[in-house]
């Protein structure tokens, strides 16, 4: 059963109309309240290095890599949203990227303190993004790309919030207070604000009827065909790694409950006409695929290097 007790409640659908002014004010507050976490603010004390590495080493490896891929994410946004407004530019260039890169650097140093290898982020912009970017100067296409970006952001940030809360709970149970209080807690405090930005922005597009019915239809089709879990980058290696993250955090015990948490925003905005559907089926499909790939890896007794090297 999915344990929602430790999952912080995200903002529900706002009843009032979301204006661009409200979104801009939210971005400004994020920048003021949560400056990037300084490396020298971290207490590097680890009481039982071997135990932390055994229980959370793989998860920290994965999250460090994903956070360090923010520079590629920004490049993708420059391709997909060539006419992004000032609020979006401020968010991804002045708030999100500086915060996320520090998360990655801090986690990367932690994993090396645990005796593990440094992160190797995947920084190549995909061919699919480049193709879509070639059409992004057309406003109808850019509007679709923008909604896809907001939905992807909401999904990935929700996954991050759940993971960091699970890790924090685990570190506290291990008595690793330095890691909990000076690494995981500061990081997890910044992620919900990112989620709120994506949720507000996507909701505003639907409320304002920015997309015509044919654009929404195409968005649904593209979302169904292109959905990926955070950090998997459409690669089997990373999909199996993500399956390992879910297993280590105990999220594989109730994949439907996890899918419900991850897919709440797009289920409401894209699939409201499908009454009774709790989450888009493609999210559960992606979760199952990652877990199955991870279990296949375990069954073969292979390391990542042996399997994909």
Regions from the PLM with identified roles:
Residues 2-309:
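Non-heme di-metal
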């Amino acid at each position: 059963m999915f344990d929602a007790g430790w999952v912080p409640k995200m903002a529900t659908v706002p009843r009032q109309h979301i204006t661009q002014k409200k979104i801009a004010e939210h971005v400004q507050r994020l920048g003021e309240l949560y400056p990037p976490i300084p490396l020298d603010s971290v207490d590097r004390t680890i009481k039982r290095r071997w135990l932390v590495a055994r229980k959370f080493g793989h998860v920290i490896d994965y999250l460090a890599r994903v956070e360090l891929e923010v520079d590629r994410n920004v490049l993708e946004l420059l391709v997909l949203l060539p006419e992004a407004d000032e609020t979006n530019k401020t968010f991804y260039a002045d708030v999100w990227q500086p915060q996320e890169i520090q998360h990655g650097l801090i986690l990367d140093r932690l994993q090396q303190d645990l005796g593990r290898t440094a992160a190797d982020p995947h920084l190549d912009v995909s061919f699919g993004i480049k193709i879509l970017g070639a059409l992004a100067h057309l406003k109808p296409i850019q509007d679709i790309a923008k909604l896809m970006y907001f939905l992807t952001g909401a999904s990935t940030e929700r996954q991050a919030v759940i993971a960091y809360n699970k890790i924090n709970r685990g570190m506290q149970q291990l008595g690793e207070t330095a890691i909990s209080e000076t690494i995981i807690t500061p990081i997890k405090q910044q992620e919900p604000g990112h989620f709120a930005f994506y949720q507000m922005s996507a909701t505003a597009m639907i409320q304002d009827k920015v997309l015509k019915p044919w654009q929404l239809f195409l968005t649904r089709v593209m979302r169904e065909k292109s959905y990926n879990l955070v950090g998997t980058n459409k690669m089997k290696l990373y999909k199996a790694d993500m399956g390992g993250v879910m297993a280590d955090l105990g999220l594989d015990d109730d994949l439907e409950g996890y899918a419900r948490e991850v897919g709440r925003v797009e289920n409401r905005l894209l699939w409201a006409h499908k009454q009774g559907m709790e989450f888009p089926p493609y999210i559960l499909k992606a979760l199952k695929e990652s877990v199955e790939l991870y279990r296949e890896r375990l069954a073969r007794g292979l390391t990542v290097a042996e399997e994909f090297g």
